[in-house]
Every structure is written in C-alpha cells, then in structure tokens.
Swiss-Prot record:
GO terms for cellular component: cytoplasm; nucleus. One of its GO terms (molecular function) is zinc ion binding. One of its GO terms (biological process) is carbon catabolite repression of transcription from RNA polymerase II promoter by glucose. It holds the Pfam family zf-C2H2. Transcription regulator component of the regulatory network controlling carbon source utilization through ubiquitination and deubiquitination involving creA, creB, creC, creD and acrB. Represses the transcription of the alcR, alcA and aldA genes by binding to a GC-rich region in their promoter. Also plays a role in response to carbon starvation and the control of extracellular proteases activity. Disulfide bonds: none annotated. Gene3D superfamilies: Classic Zinc Finger. Residues 15-49, 289-303 have a biased composition (Low complexity). Its main location: nucleus. It comes from Aspergillus niger. This is DNA-binding protein creA.
Amino acid sequence: MPPPASSVDFSNLLNPQNNSTDSTPSTPVDSSKTPSTPSSTQSNSNMASSVSLLPPLMKGARPATEEVRQDLPRPYKCPLCDRAFHRLEHQTRHIRTHTGEKPHACQFPGCTKRFSRSDELTRHSRIHNNPNSRRRNKAQHLAAAAAAAAGQDNAMANTASAMMPPPSKPMTRSAPVSQVGSPDISPPHSFSNYASHMRSNLGPYARKGDEASSGMELYLLATAASQVERDEHFDFHAGPRNHHLFSSRHHGSGRLPLLAAYAITHNMSRSHSPEDDDGYSHRVKRSRPNSPNSTAPSSPTFSHDSLSPTPDHTPLATPAHSPRLRPLGSSDLHLPSIRHLSLHHTPALAPMEPQPEGPNYYSPSQGHHGPSISDIMSKPDGTQRKLPVPQVPKVAVQDMLNPGSGFSSVHSSTANSVAGGDLAERF
C-alpha cells in the first residue's frame, strides 16, 4: 500500500537518500515493474507540486500580491508615451521626465540645484546637513576664501585711496635759481635739515589718509589763516630784508585755495628747531636738495590751482618790474643779464617801486571803455540806442603801424560808435 501524498512529499524533500535507497531494491524484481510505474509517476508529480509551493512559503506570498497588483486598473496614462500609472503623483513625476521640469529647489544658501522629485531633494539636503560631508567643507572653505579676498581687495582700495595725493592740487616745483642770481647764501647745515624734511614729510604719498577729510581741510584753513597773520606781523617788524615777502603775500592772502596751499607748505616744512623762529630760515629749507649752495626758491615755489598771476612766494631777489606780475609784452620787459647781477644784498625798496599802469601793461582793461547796455537803452533818443561796434576791428591800419597812438585810436573809435557812426566813416 503506498504512503499518503503529504508524507511522501515531505519525506522526499527532507530525506532524498532514503527515497533513492527504497527505490533501488525494486529494480531487480521484474514482476514489480508494471505496478511501480504509476507509483513513480505519481511521486514525481507530487514533488513538482511541493517545489512549486515552496517559494510562497519562504517569501511570504509576495508573488501572489504582485499578480494581484498587476491586475489593478491603471487610470493615469502618460499623454506623451504608452505608460500608465495607478496613482496621480506617479504620473506627475513621470511627466516631468519628458518636460524637464524641476520644481524642487534646494533652500540652502548658496546652492542653486533643483530637482524634479522630492525624494531627490531630500537626499541632496543631507549633503548640506551632514557636518562630515566633504562637499560641505569644500563649499565653506571656498566661501571663506572669497570673503577674505573681498575684504583684502576693499582694504587695498582704501589704502590706495588714502595714499593717493589729491589730484586737484598737483605739487610742481620750478627749476632752482643759480648761485649767481641768489644774493643770500645758506648756512652749512641747512641742506641736511632740508633733506631730512624732504624724506619724512614732503613726499605726496607720506600724508595720512585723514587729511583728505572735510574736518582736516577746515583745520588746515584755520591754521593757514592764523599762520598768515602771524607771518605778516613778523615780516612787518623784521626789517628791509623780508619786506618784499610781506608785500607780495599781501595780495594773495585772501584766497582760500592759497590758504590751503600755504597751510600744507608750512605743515610740511615745520619743525621745532630754533631756526624756525626766524621767518627767513623756514623758507631756506624749501630749496631743492640738489642745489645746496642756493637758498633762493624760484618764483613761484609751489603752484596750486590758482588762476591769479600773484604767486604764493616771491624770490628773495625780486626782478626790477612790478610785483603784481601783470602780463607784459616781450618788448616792454628788460631784465638785467646774469653778469650784471651782484652777490650783495639788494636795496630795501628799490625793486619794489610800482610802475605806473600804462595802457600796454594790462590789455583786458581796454575792453571796458564806453557806455554799458543799460545806459544805451535808457537814452530818450531812439537814434542813440545803438550798440557799439565790437572793438576788435576798430583799429585802423595806421594805428597798427604806429603802436604809440593805439590807445587814442581806441578812444576815438569808441566815441564814434557811441555817436552812431559806422565803420566807413572812421576809415
């Protein structure tokens, strides 16, 4: 009698050797071949059924649920391809693969990455939140390096702006006067003193950055005003030697740019040595270092943006012409040659006598003769309300050939224009 199917199945699975030993002695019996064939066929079919039942027992019956899920309806179909999905969010996520849309952006400061799926964004955010991440450490190092470089650039820009001299006040020095033209000889130690001041204070890049502020400019103006008053008072009592310095500075002391230039000049050449008590010694220090035997600074010593012809400082040996330095013609100015100059002290007031203001010394004053526009318009007679002809073409050929009578010809032409005459009558 054959055993039950369940016992045969488990016995064959657990003890395959016993099954083979049981089947071997039945082979030599010839009479049992015919009945053993159906029994062996039945046992093989039972083994196949038991093997097919083993995966559901071992894997928790997962293939059965997958088969059930495959049978569920897929209502959400992709309009761009043939795929269909059970849930709407799966369809939406799939459509983004076609369109390239990435709505999930990283919220970390400095990160510009975007993702089409929220789980990818979550996985990416762990990079920023993980303190041991190499990428995060590298990003922090790059940010710190960029901040340090920006701070260094700002510091260099501030330093450069503080060291740059003000472009509106270029400090130019003219050529030094030779020893023959200077009547005063410097003491032996003035060159070394000036050289030390030149290295320490006179360089345009050696100024401090706070001198460019408005408060320091006001302080410079106030200091310059007090220094001008004190020096003028000192020069007034100093005697004939410095009298021309006072008179030349008296014309330019009321201009604010010159006050600032005067303050900068005095601040750069000021020291607390006994030599500065004299109004002459601090001007000696402004001589150029490559001419130690000459102490007379040329005229003008410092040129700042002042449009006035009067310089800040005049030379110690004043030329024999007007101290106002009006524009003179080349034929009117006759200076003595270098060979005729002496090394002795010049007379006190001899070169300072002002020359009479002739018509040829200052040409712009000639253009203001004649009535003004208000005088012409206020005349009761209508025939006299005529503007004068411009004075440039009024000079006749005879007046140009005879420059001595040019001034009278201008007056006569002006009178004719006021009277109403035209150009043809004058010729």
